[in-house]
Amino acid sequence: MKQLVLIRHGESAWNLENRFTGWADVDLTPKGAEQALAAGENLKKAGYEFDVAYTSVLRRAIRTLWNVQDTMDLMWLPVVHSWRLNERHYGALTGLNKAETAEKYGDEQVHIWRRSYDVRPPLLEHEDERHPKNDPRYSKLNSSDIPLGECLKDNVERVLPLWNESIAPALKAGKRVLLVAHGNSIRSLIKYLDQVSNEDIMEVNVPNGIPLVYELDDDLKPIQHFYLD
């Protein structure tokens, strides 16, 4: 049996403020930090151990992983940081309050942007200061790989190369994998692992800071999965 544990980062400052976050690099709230520590405690009490960890290049996920590692006495654990595990890029909506955006564009339009599988939000302009090209952590990416806004379909297509090239081989080699990322990058993996339809995946919500344990067979097909809280 192969072991994969997925954790969405703890509550972030913009989660609390009800803003579209995406690739904006906001930090955890005190509550979010506590959620991360609690996740580590629950994993430790349940006897989980890990050989490698994966996370995004955004601090709310990285700090969540640090707190889990610290609680589990696993600060030595090898960690792979990848932009492919970043949150879905919300384009020109980044930083906007969700309720105020709904007032401006209408509830139905915002619902489509948030919950449609293949409809992108309004894209960033190339001159926008929020463009990822202005961030040094993405300086080595090809310009064609840098999103200006993503739907969940784009997010799935971004995450799967990392799964196929790194995470899946690690699992098949017997490594116990901890992955700390974001709501939509984790939903992308859930969709792939559980073969969830395009329609049904839109109703899947991933809670902050609660470990989602997958037990997989040798072909990496799910035997069972459950939340550990």
From Swiss-Prot:
Under InterPro entries, the record lists: His_Pase_superF_clade-1, His_PPase_superfam, PG/BPGM_mutase_AS, Phosphogly_mut1
Q: Which UniProt keywords apply?
A: Gluconeogenesis, Glycolysis, Isomerase
* Domain of life of the native organism: Bacteria
Q: What reaction does this catalyse? A: (2R)-2-phosphoglycerate = (2R)-3-phosphoglycerate
Q: What class of enzyme is it?
A: isomerase
Q: Could you tell me the EC number(s) of this protein? A: 5.4.2.11
- Is Amino-acid biosynthesis one of the keywords? no
Q: Can you tell me which residues form the catalytic site? A: 9, 87
**PROSITE patterns for the chain:** PG_MUTASE
HAMAP family noted in UniProt: PGAM_GpmA (MF_01039)
This protein's assembly is summarised as: Homodimer.
Instruction: Indicate the family of this protein.
Output: Belongs to the phosphoglycerate mutase family. BPG-dependent PGAM subfamily.
NCBIfam families noted in UniProt:
pgm_1, PRK14115.1
Q: What does this protein do?
A: Catalyzes the interconversion of 2-phosphoglycerate and 3-phosphoglycerate.
In Swiss-Prot or TrEMBL terms, this protein is called: 2,3-bisphosphoglycerate-dependent phosphoglycerate mutase
Query: What is the organism of origin for this protein?
Result: Polynucleobacter necessarius subsp. necessarius (strain STIR1)
